[in-house]
Amino acid sequence: VRGSSDAAGYDLFSTDSYVVLPGRRVVVSTGISIQLPPGTYGSIRPRSGLAVKHGLDVLAGVIDPDYQGEVKVVLQNLDMNQPFVIRPGYRIAQLILENYTVAEVVETPTEFTGLVTERGDSAAEAARRGAAGFGSTGL
């Protein structure tokens, strides 16, 4: 279910009741399994209202296209004082479908290990950035 016709994500619902204690996390069942369109994977993301109003966050979740099991969501209660109660039918997260590209990993003669795009360009040729990272290109 999408919240509106322009919503990027599909709402995921809890099938059971859970109590998420302060600072703890739980794995929540959704009761669904999905078949993804070719060339896509599923990304499980938080719902902004749960995060802002209740301090409930979704930990990273990736659904690979060949996964056939139940979609489950890892929720963490960031509120250190109050438990959060989840009831059946609560919208707990959203599923966003994203396209992906499989790149060939190629080892180079230097310490850099790069990726080759579908065009055959290496990431090193495209970036020419070197080994600097984490803020090396500025703000």
Question: What spans do the regions from the language model cover?
Answer:
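DUTPase catalytic domain/fold
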Residues: 1-139
